[in-house]
Amino acid sequence: MDGIVTRNEPETEWEEFDRAFYEVKDVTGRPNEPIAGAINMVSCFGDNAAAGENPDLVPIDSEGHKATRERAYFDWDYICPTHDAYREGLLEMISDCAAANDTVRLDDVGFPREDYCRCDRCEQRFAASEFDDWVAWRESVITEFVAAASERVPGRLYLTLYPDPYPGHLSERAGIDLAALRPYVDEFVVPLYDLEYGTTYWLESLARGFRSALGGSYAVDGSDPDTPFSIELYAVDVDVDNLIQAAEVAGTYAKEVFFGYDAAQASAAIRRQDADQQDGKTYGSE
């Protein structure tokens, strides 16, 4: 199964794609109306527009540094996951998405990095909580949000994960507890982006790591993960042969492969791959 991730509604109807994800809100904060013909996708706690309009929404670390694009390693502005009004707005948007199409994908779920958020609200809620451990409290915040979102989605719920499968890293970084999220999530999506895909050994390592992290066997022909995961590849201006190779590697370990933000290039790769299979060829580097 091949899918597309797009901001352009007409591309969701291309026949080459078995599945389409349509960005209702991306990290810029730009909103679009949900559509019925695709899986609507919401960037949850990445929102440049909201952060720019209301700096009080932005998480801070223990030294008072804000989680914005002005800092190293931050590609967009973040919103604190404990801000009640913002969360309620997100949940309303998720409900609207589910009304158009009963399957929804959540993107950018979690705290921005380790040591976030240390705003007064987070500090007070941690102090008043049942938790003695800061990491466990952060996990509870994110799990509660995903649980609330799942109640508003009658169909399948997809959740995007930061591409780091190593034990404990998702928890330390974002407050993501995979085991706690499994009852609410039907499928995880892992973006493994590169501008060229000139090599794929790293892609295989990460894909296999997520297979293990989600409860699957290390062996490809062993047991599947407890919750399935798919891999999203970056298709913009990537050489078609390289994109095909990356898709074949990803497809070995993941349930499905999705292509991001270049429908024409993704379509070309799918058509080439289908033609090679019909000719009885096995794709490989020449």
Give a label for each model feature.
Residues 1-34, 96-103, 181-187, 250-257:
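Catalytic domains of carbohydrate-active enzymes, especially glycoside hydrolases
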Residues 103-133:
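Active-site-proximal loop/short-helix segments
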Residues 19-22, 72-91, 133-140, 191-196, ...:
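The substrate-binding groove and active-site-proximal loops of carbohydrate-active enzymes
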Residues 78-110, 152, 177-181:
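An active-site-proximal structural segment forming one wall of the substrate-binding cleft
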Residues 192-199, 221, 227-286:
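Substrate-binding cleft of secreted/luminal carbohydrate-active enzymes
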